[in-house]
Structures are given as structure tokens and as C-alpha cells.
Amino acid sequence: MINDIQKTAEGKMQRSVEVLKENLAKVRTGRAHTGLLDQVEVEYWGSMVPVSQVANVTLLDARTIGVKPFEGNMAAKVEKAIRDSNLGLNPAAVGDLIRVPMPMLTEERRKDLIKVVRGEAEEGRVSIRNVRRDANDHIKKLLKDKEISEDEARRGEEAVQKLTDKYIAEADKVLAAKEEDLMAV
């Protein structure tokens, strides 16, 4: 019974760390990556679709994304969608290739982004702690209903605490890597 609670808690904690990684990946650094354009949508035959469905998105170099539409007539629409995306990007069409250079981040902007990243990491840690609280509440309920002994309850809570420490450390590691990435010039 305690093992089921631990497995459930570990799965939820792992998911919290995954969500944190996904959220931090959306924060733009000075380095180019194709995932940056994932949320940019362009109109295609009357419906809005992600850029990746109407164009080939590649890295030209560490600071430039290349976007090559599958159909030549889509280049202007794709360029406009990227420009209007609120990502602070300024694409330039060169023939049928759209070059998207990554602007340099100012020191002030880097510090603002670090604050955002730290906030996201704290949300991840809170989520992990909430999973711990739920698991401990479940263990206490089993103890109250006399389904487990006090020793089993204590061991269960200690195991859940170890899981919590492990996943909070992992969240901190993810945060440190992102901060380092942001501060790299």
C-alpha cells in the first residue's frame, strides 16, 4: 500500500520536473533553437497551423534559424507570422529561405529572464512539495484507519521525503543549467 503511494508520488514529482523543463525551454536565450518557433502559427488554407507544418525549420548556425517553406507562396506569410509573434525576432527573406537571426540579449534583459526562470523553478518546487503533502496525507489517513502501523507510516513518510529531496535537487539542477545558459554571452 505504501509502495503504491510512493510510486504515484514519484510519477507526479517526475512529471513536475518535466513540466519545469518544458517551461524553461520556452524562455529565449541568446542561442538559436528550432523549438523557439513551435508556438508560431501561420494561416494556411483558411486555418492556423504551426510553422513547422508548412516549412522546414533548421539551424543555420548557433545564432540563426533557417525557415524554408514547402510552397514558395507561403514565404511572405511565414515571415509575417514570425515577425508578429511577440518573440522579438526580425526575420529576413533571402529568396525562398527566411533567415531568423537571434538578437543579442542585454544584461538587463538577461537579469529579467533569470527572475522569470527562478519563478518557474519555484513553481516546480511547490508542485513537488504539494505531491509530498498529498502522499503524507494519504499515509496519515491509512494510519488513522488502522490499515498500517506507526512504524510503516514513519518509513513511508521518510521515503516520500527522500523522493521530494531528490526531485527538488533535480529541479534546482535544471534551473542552474538554464541560468548558466542565459548568462553565457
Curated annotation (Swiss-Prot):
- The answer to whether keyword Cytoplasm applies is yes
Domain of life the protein comes from: Bacteria
Query: Under what name is this protein listed?
Result: Ribosome-recycling factor
Transmembrane region(s): none
Q: Name one GO cellular component term.
A: cytosol
Which cysteines pair up through disulfides? They are none
Task: Return any one Pfam family short name.
Answer: RRF
**Gene encoding this chain?**
frr
**GO MF annotations, alphabetized:** ribosomal large subunit binding
Primary residence: cytoplasm
- InterPro entries associated with the record: Ribosome_recyc_fac (IPR002661), Ribosome_recyc_fac_dom (IPR023584), RRF_sf (IPR036191)
Tell me, in a sentence or two, what this protein's role is.
Answer: Responsible for the release of ribosomes from messenger RNA at the termination of protein biosynthesis. May increase the efficiency of translation by recycling ribosomes from one round of translation to another.
Compartments where located: Cytoplasm
Name the family.
Answer: Belongs to the RRF family.
Q: Which UniProt keywords apply?
A: Cytoplasm, Protein biosynthesis
